[in-house]
From Swiss-Prot:
Transmembrane regions: none
Protein name per UniProt: UPF0145 protein CLH_2273
Highest rank taxon of the organism: Bacteria
PANTHER family given in the database record: UPF0145 PROTEIN YBJQ
Family recorded in the similarity comment: Belongs to the UPF0145 family.
Entry coiled-coil feature ranges: none
SUPFAM superfamilies, per the entry: YbjQ-like (SSF117782)
Length: 106
């Protein structure tokens, strides 16, 4: 499946617009990850713990969006946008939303 941030796919004609499609993931960040990330930040390094969590959440949201597009009969998703939001009273949750337009192209 072609997934792109552009509104069209070069060299392909969009034959049918299936509709807007979403993929959402909410991921909690636990105490051990917070502690490891805090040490990394203290010593001036990058927080691989949080980066890995972010990458994993983004990949899951994209896959969920792709699966929903397939269920709609699409073979591509155009105009993809990914949003990130921190949730919870202690900012302990990360929400990643992938959205786009499911299309059928030649």
């Amino acid at each position: 499946m072609i997934i792109t941030t552009t509104p069209a796919i070069e060299g392909k004609n969009i034959l049918e617009y299936k509709g807007v499609v979403f993929g959402e993931v909410i991921s909690g960040v636990n105490f051990i990850k917070d502690f490891a990330a805090g040490l990394s930040n203290f010593f001036g390094g990058r927080s691989n713990t949080y980066e890995d969590e972010l990458i994993g959440a983004r990949e899951k949201a994209m896959k969920e969006m792709e699966n929903r597009a397939i269920q709609m009969g699409a073979n591509a998703v155009v105009g993809v946008d990914i949003d990130y939001e921190v949730l919870g009273s202690d900012n302990g949750m990360l929400m990643v939303t992938a959205s786009g337009t499911a299309v059928y192209c030649e």
